[in-house]
């Protein structure tokens, strides 16, 4: 019995579409090719135009950009001949994606914008949502956060009205809207959006949105982080993207808490799940930068303790991470690809953390991070200023350090970025930046315990906090940005003022007086 070729073509085209959704690019390309071959070019048919457009997508995802571009152009010609304008518009989105791969992000955005407007005029929701997602994503990559938020919001509303909020593009538009406001510092709005990203998830779509909520949870130090992790972990095996988002942010969460071992474990697990066939891509940059920060912290602690062997081992491990970040930026599979603003900012941060791990906390490197993110990326610029202030303080550039520190602290307080605020206040106390904390009745000059400790200066109190924490003179010097000899003098003065015979006795007196040990 003869099979209807039009029906067979439609079946193969739909098969290709769904195989593409499952990331089976090779099988999808084969099915789409059959869909095209089943129908002749003449007479013009909408089904053949649709098959050509889908084949273009499968070729693109299979990595054959030249053939994909040719097929997309053929799809547009066939669509015009068959009076299928929605297919012509859909192929335009594919051409925009191909322009990005050819290193033409501005041209790509123009094509996405054109396709979005055409799809709206045609009232073709499926094509409209695809174009909206690509347009919003490209706007986010270019650093135009306001435009990205507006496009994602509009597209998301259209998806929601059609009951597609958890369908692929509806879901993607929700998280792009949220990410744009996370990046631009509109955290109240981002928080309202994240309120809809439930913690107790039961589906893969819900889990992906919940993973996105970790951006804000981690940056604000929310207690919801641990519960989200518990609910998300079962979904990681089936959703590599969701796992990438969640574990990378959980690494940042551990880093804020000073738990470098857990941070590195999350980074290692994330890297292990990445597809490295043909080399790393841009997503590795952020994860590698977080790992480099952890390696840098461990290397600095080792140097402060005089453990050069451990410090050298940390540098060796950090080399692997910076190599991964640089490879991701080069993107061997798409050598013409141009990194967006966020990607360039994280690459600059990775380079600065690499220098820090080697013992060179370079102010110029951190200044480059601040400038690369720029004022639009409110939070990332603020936390880059934190590192810049630290580097400037270590270099003895106190006025510059205080300026960067003050700018970062103002943003941290405005956003409610609690972990960053804590880190900045710790830096301010150690490097003596800004006004000292106010003191209440009966308190010492830094607001701490009084009476037996009343004779200590604010700097001696900081040294004593570190003594209580068991730090050596060298570690105290590193923590407070002073010379080891100066630290030794402070310790001697403290022992004399407290009439203590040893460091241990001084620490015991301080503990009895209620002085809390320094963190770390």
Q: Model-predicted segments: where are they?
A:
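Amphipathic helix-loop-helix modules that constitute alpha-helical solenoid scaffolds
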Residues: 19-31, 60-66, 244-246, 274-358, ...
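Structural signature of tandem alpha-helical TPR/SEL1-like repeats
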Residues: 27-34, 67-74, 107-111
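N-terminal regulatory/sensing modules of transcriptional regulators
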Residues: 354, 360, 378-380, 386-446, ...
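Single-residue signature of alpha-solenoid repeat helices
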Residues: 28, 68, 108, 148, ...
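Tandem amphipathic alpha-helical repeat scaffolds
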Residues: 9-24, 47-64, 87-104, 127-144, ...
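Residue signature of alpha-solenoid helical repeat architecture, marking inter-repeat boundaries
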Residues: 6, 46, 86, 126, ...
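Helix-turn-helix DNA-binding segment
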Residues: 429, 440-501, 505-520
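Amphipathic alpha-helical segments of tetratricopeptide repeats
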Residues: 1, 33-43, 73-83, 113-124, ...
């Amino acid at each position: 019995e003869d099979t209807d070729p039009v029906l067979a073509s439609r079946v193969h085209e739909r098969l290709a579409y769904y195989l593409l959704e499952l990331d089976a690019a090779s099988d999808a390309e084969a099915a789409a090719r059959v869909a095209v071959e089943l129908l002749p070019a003449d007479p013009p048919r909408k089904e053949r135009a649709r098959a050509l457009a889908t084949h273009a997508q499968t070729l693109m995802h299979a990595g054959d950009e030249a053939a994909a571009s040719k097929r997309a152009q053929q799809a547009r010609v066939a669509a015009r001949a068959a009076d299928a304008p929605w297919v012509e518009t859909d192929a335009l989105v594919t051409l925009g994606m191909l322009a990005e791969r050819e290193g033409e992000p501005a041209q790509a955005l123009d094509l996405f914008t054109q396709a979005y407007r055409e799809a709206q005029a045609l009232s073709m929701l499926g094509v409209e949502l695809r174009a909206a997602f690509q347009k919003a994503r490209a706007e986010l990559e270019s650093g135009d956060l306001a435009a990205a938020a507006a496009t994602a919001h509009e597209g998301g509303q259209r998806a929601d009205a059609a009951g597609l909020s958890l369908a692929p593009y509806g879901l993607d538009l929700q998280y792009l809207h949220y990410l744009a406001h996370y990046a631009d510092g509109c955290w109240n709005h981002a928080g309202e959006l994240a309120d809809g990203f439930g913690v107790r998830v039961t589906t893969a779509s819900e889990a992906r949105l919940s993973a996105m909520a970790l951006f804000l949870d981690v940056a604000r130090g929310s207690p919801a982080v641990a519960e989200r992790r518990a609910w998300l972990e079962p979904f990681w095996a089936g959703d590599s993207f969701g796992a990438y988002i969640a574990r990378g942010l959980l690494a940042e969460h551990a880093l804020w808490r000073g738990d470098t071992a857990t941070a590195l474990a999350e980074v290692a697990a994330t890297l292990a799940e990445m597809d490295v066939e043909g080399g790393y891509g841009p997503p590795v940059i952020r994860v590698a930068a977080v790992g480099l920060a952890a390696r840098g912290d461990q290397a600095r602690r080792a140097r402060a303790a005089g453990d050069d062997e451990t410090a050298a081992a940390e540098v060796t491990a950090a080399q692997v991470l910076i190599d991964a970040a640089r490879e991701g930026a080069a993107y061997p599979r798409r050598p013409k690809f141009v990194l967006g603003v966020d990607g360039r900012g994280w690459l600059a941060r990775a380079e600065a953390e690499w220098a820090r791990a080697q013992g060179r906390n370079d102010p110029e490197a951190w200044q480059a991070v601040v400038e690369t993110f720029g004022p639009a990326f409110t939070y990332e610029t603020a936390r880059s200023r934190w590192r810049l202030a630290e580097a400037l303080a270590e270099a003895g550039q106190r006025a510059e350090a205080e300026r960067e520190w003050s700018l970062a602290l103002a943003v941290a307080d405005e956003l409610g970025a609690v972990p960053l605020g804590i880190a900045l206040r710790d830096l301010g106390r150690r490097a003596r930046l800004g006004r000292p904390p106010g003191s209440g009745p009966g308190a010492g000059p830094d607001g701490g315990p009084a009476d037996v400790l009343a004779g200590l200066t604010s700097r001696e109190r900081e040294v004593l906090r570190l003594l209580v924490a068991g730090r050596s003179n060298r570690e105290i010097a590193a923590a407070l940005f002073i010379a080891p000899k100066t630290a030794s003098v402070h310790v001697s003065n403290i022992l004399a003022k407290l009439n203590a015979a040893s460091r241990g006795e001084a620490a015991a007196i301080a503990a009895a007086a209620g002085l809390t040990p320094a963190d770390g």
